[in-house]
């Protein structure tokens, strides 16, 4: 298999692990910085260049796309798709999952529960918007944030109004959600590959914080997701069109609630905590999907 990995940094743990495993399994692998890819769009002739040279013939591409380059990198990934290259996470699925509002709407439409969420635009509606949500504490989130950045806990209604007004003044898109106190500032990261959860870890927020992200000082321990939690995680990934995803859940009195579905979840924390070789499961999944596609006589490269 000729495999491309879209990544801005070849030294990142997740990128290195995927390259290592793919080469160990006999595949030809190249890391491509999506911002150095550029394309020509012509009816019947989609092409791509990288650092001055044409690139084609890739059987599969694994996207490791950061939030800051989502839209351009998704366009690059879409061009690969139009050239007949398979991706476990298609460009449209990445765009769906990176837009928290859109993702929440799609998940709710599939009957997947999450913290109650409100969204609005006009300052005149702020008080009624918060009334729809219920009493504080409230969680205010930037719509396209990541790794816990842009997530604020507001313990008073007046503080929530102030935050909403400040974010509107910055022309930032945001959501406001109910705070689930019984989650005890912890969540589960369920790593979905294909039709199953292949690894799980429990993340606990650092003392004095409520965000459990490891990048913000949270700690992680090995965990086992219940059958219900695994089912919710897989359904959530598939509802957005993803086959590789990190699904973040919290445990509540009404069952598992989805916080976020990450289309490019990091491998370092989950592999170290769970002891599972997640990278090889991703590469094997790509191999299996390509075998299915090629057996259907639609394998183009």
Curated annotation (Swiss-Prot):
GO terms for biological process: protein modification process; SOS response; translation. PROSITE patterns: ATP_GRASP. Keywords: ATP-binding, Ligase, Magnesium, Manganese, Metal-binding, Nucleotide-binding, Protein biosynthesis. Its EC number is 6.3.2.-. ATP binds at residues 141, 178-179, 187, 211-213. Mg(2+) 2 binds at residues 260, 262. GO terms for cellular component: cytoplasm. Mg(2+) 1 binds at residues 248, 260. One of its GO terms (molecular function) is ATP binding. This is Probable alpha-L-glutamate ligase. It comes from Xylella fastidiosa (strain Temecula1 / ATCC 700964).
């Amino acid at each position: 298999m000729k495999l491309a990995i879209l990544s801005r940094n070849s030294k990142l743990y997740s990128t290195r692990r995927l390259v290592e495993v793919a080469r160990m399994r006999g595949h030809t692998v190249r890391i491509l910085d999506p911002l150095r890819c550029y394309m020509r769009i012509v009816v019947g002739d989609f092409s791509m260049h990288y650092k001055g040279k044409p690139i084609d013939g890739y059987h599969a591409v694994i996207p490791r796309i950061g939030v800051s380059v989502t839209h351009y990198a998704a366009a690059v990934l879409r061009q690969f798709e139009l050239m007949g290259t398979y991706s476990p996470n298609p460009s449209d699925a990445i765009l769906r999952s990176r837009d928290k509002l859109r993702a929440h709407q799609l998940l709710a439409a599939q009957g997947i529960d999450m913290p109650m969420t409100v969204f609005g635009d006009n300052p005149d509606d702020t008080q009624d918007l918060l009334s729809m949500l219920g009493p504080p504490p409230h969680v205010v989130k930037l719509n396209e944030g990541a790794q816990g950045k842009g997530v604020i806990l507001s313990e008073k209604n007046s503080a929530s109004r102030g935050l909403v007004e400040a974010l509107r003044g910055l022309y930032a898109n945001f959501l406001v959600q109910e705070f689930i106190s019984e989650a005890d500032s912890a969540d589960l990261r369920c790593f979905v590959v294909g039709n199953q959860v292949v690894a799980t870890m429990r993340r606990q927020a650092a003392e004095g914080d409520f965000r459990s992200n490891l990048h913000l000082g949270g700690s992680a321990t090995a965990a086992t997701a219940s059958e219900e939690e695994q089912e919710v995680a897989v359904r959530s990934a598939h509802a957005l069109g993803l086959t590789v995803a990190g699904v973040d859940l919290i445990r509540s009195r009404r069952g598992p609630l989805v916080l976020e579905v990450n289309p490019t979840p990091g491998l370092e924390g989950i592999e170290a905590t769970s002891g599972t070789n997640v990278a090889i499961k991703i590469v094997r999944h790509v191999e299996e999907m390509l075998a299915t596609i090629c057996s259907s006589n639609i394998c183009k490269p």
